[in-house]
Amino acid sequence: MAVQKRLFLLDAYALIFRGYYALIKNPRVNSKGQDTSAIMGFVNSLFDVIKREKPDHLAVAFDKGGSSERVEMYEDYKANRDETPEAIRIAVPIIQEILKAMHVPCIEIEGVEADDLIGTLAKQAEKEDYQVFMVTPDKDYAQLVSENIFMYKPARMGNGIEIWGIPEVQKRFEVER
């Protein structure tokens, strides 16, 4: 039997926010005084995945314009969220340029959130016999885990990476299949 190809799909904003807030008490600042914590955190996560996992395929999904469909269904969708910090807003185009220079595909569709893109791509790739790893700290992705779709939670605060398959999701959320 042929070895399954492995596709890694990264949730850009989940990793960018995580990188930024991980260093909130001791931000990384460049010579121009710009907070580069979000950039450093994201790039470190990306490089760790590439070095550790050597994926066959890799892509990064970005939110673009929020979920118009969800706002139509529920007017207050994400209405209580704080405004995105300026350092993150500045970091996003820089991260996209880094990804472009590395020839890493960036996926975004107006009015569609990254988690919906990743979920759709993961299910499509699974049908094509890929093993899919959704790289994110966001537990909401657990609902997508299947025989060939896994959550890949990057290392944080001295803990190693976590890969959640069906048994890990069942244990974590105390659910049965």
Task: Name these PLM-found stretches.
Residues 8, 59-62, 134, 153:
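Structural beta-sheet core signal
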